[in-house]
């Protein structure tokens, strides 16, 4: 299906065609960087849900450039293949799988990313609550893999839809980042519910053990049960067991809240 006449009249659509961008969404990332300098000092970047590649294209032009800096490494991840881009390594993978995070780190020679971005979105149904929920789950999946692959102090940017539960999303991100804000670049249509969540200075909770979790959290009771079992067994715990218990205790608080905003656990998060 061809582009609508509305798209063809859009200044950014025309500009994208003129400048050779794969999609008008390239300007959204460019404008976020121009206002917030998210590319400053960045060497290792991950583009999640990257296809068709307009954001990876921005990274290729703005960060990889002429390729003279051997420390610059860009990884694009998507279930779909996309046309090659200069300086961008592509991973055809699922962001909800731990194996994908290991592939990313291997391309960084064991180091972690400075910046992780995601412009992904599920198919829109036109039903606001369903679309907002689907997008929120995609963001949390991106956050899951980010906790495995982003360095302390790093930055995370993701597309989201404006909705009633934005305060919940804000609270979830604030558990991991010092600074969290919602931004809307001028190239994002005013009529669109699209926003971007900008998270800076990654600082995970003390004793948080990164793991890839089911966004629906069907098995989160296993975490709680493991915590209780480890607390009740082995009264003569050694130091290692005590440390393990601290990790489990932290997970039993953080993981349910991140996965679905579950606050019905009888605990405080601080």
From Swiss-Prot:
UniProt-listed GO biological process terms: cytoplasmic translation; neurogenesis; tRNA methylation; tRNA nucleoside ribose methylation; wobble position ribose methylation
Assigned keywords, A-Z: Cytoplasm, Methyltransferase, S-adenosyl-L-methionine, Transferase, tRNA processing
UniProt keyword annotation of Cytoplasm present: yes
Protein's cellular compartments: Cytoplasm
EC number annotated for this UniProt entry: 2.1.1.205
Pfam annotation, one family: FtsJ
Catalytic activity: cytidine(32)/guanosine(34) in tRNA + 2 S-adenosyl-L-methionine = 2'-O-methylcytidine(32)/2'-O-methylguanosine(34) in tRNA + 2 S-adenosyl-L-homocysteine + 2 H(+)
InterPro entries the record matches: RNA_methyltr_E_TRM7 (IPR028590), RNA_methyltr_RlmE (IPR050082), RNA_MeTrfase_FtsJ_dom (IPR002877), rRNA-MeTfrase_E (IPR015507), SAM-dependent_MTases_sf (IPR029063)
Alphabetized GO MF terms: S-adenosyl-L-methionine binding; tRNA (cytidine(32)/guanosine(34)-2'-O)-methyltransferase activity; tRNA (guanine) methyltransferase activity; tRNA methyltransferase activity
Active site: 159 (proton acceptor)
Enzyme class label: transferase
HAMAP family per UniProt: RNA_methyltr_E, RNA_methyltr_E_TRM7
Role description: Methylates the 2'-O-ribose of nucleotides at positions 32 and 34 of the tRNA anticodon loop of substrate tRNAs.
Family: Belongs to the class I-like SAM-binding methyltransferase superfamily. RNA methyltransferase RlmE family. TRM7 subfamily.
Name this protein carries in UniProt: Putative tRNA (cytidine(32)/guanosine(34)-2'-O)-methyltransferase
Organism encoding this protein: Dictyostelium discoideum (Social amoeba)
Phylogenetic lineage: Eukaryota, Amoebozoa, Evosea, Eumycetozoa, Dictyostelia
């Amino acid at each position: 299906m061809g582009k609508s006449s509305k798209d063809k009249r859009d200044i950014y659509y025309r500009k994208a065609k003129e400048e050779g961008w794969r999609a008008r969404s390239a300007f959204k990332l460019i404008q976020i960087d121009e206002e917030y300098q998210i590319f400053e000092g960045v060497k290792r970047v991950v583009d999640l849900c990257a296809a068709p590649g307009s954001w990876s294209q921005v990274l290729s032009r703005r960060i990889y450039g002429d390729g003279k800096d051997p420390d610059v490494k860009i990884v694009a991840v998507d279930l779909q293949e996309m046309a090659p881009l200069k300086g961008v390594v592509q991973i055809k993978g699922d962001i909800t799988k731990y194996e994908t995070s290991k592939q990313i780190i291997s391309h960084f020679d064991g180091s972690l990313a400075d910046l992780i971005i995601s412009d992904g979105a599920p198919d829109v149904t036109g039903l606001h609550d369903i679309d907002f929920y689907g997008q929120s789950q995609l963001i949390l999946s991106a956050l899951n893999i980010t906790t495995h692959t982003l360095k302390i102090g790093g930055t995370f940017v993701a597309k989201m839809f404006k909705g009633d539960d934005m305060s919940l999303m804000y609270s979830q991100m604030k558990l991991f980042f010092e600074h969290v804000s919602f931004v809307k670049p001028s190239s994002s249509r005013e009529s669109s519910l699209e926003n971007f969540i900008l998270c800076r200075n990654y600082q995970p909770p003390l004793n948080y053990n990164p793991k890839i979790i089911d966004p629906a959290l069907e098995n989160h009771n296993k975490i709680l049960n493991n915590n209780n079992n480890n607390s009740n067994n082995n009264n003569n715990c050694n130091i290692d067991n005590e440390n393990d218990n601290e990790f489990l205790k932290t997970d039993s608080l953080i993981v349910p809240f991140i996965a679905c905003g579950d606050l019905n656990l009888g605990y405080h998060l601080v």
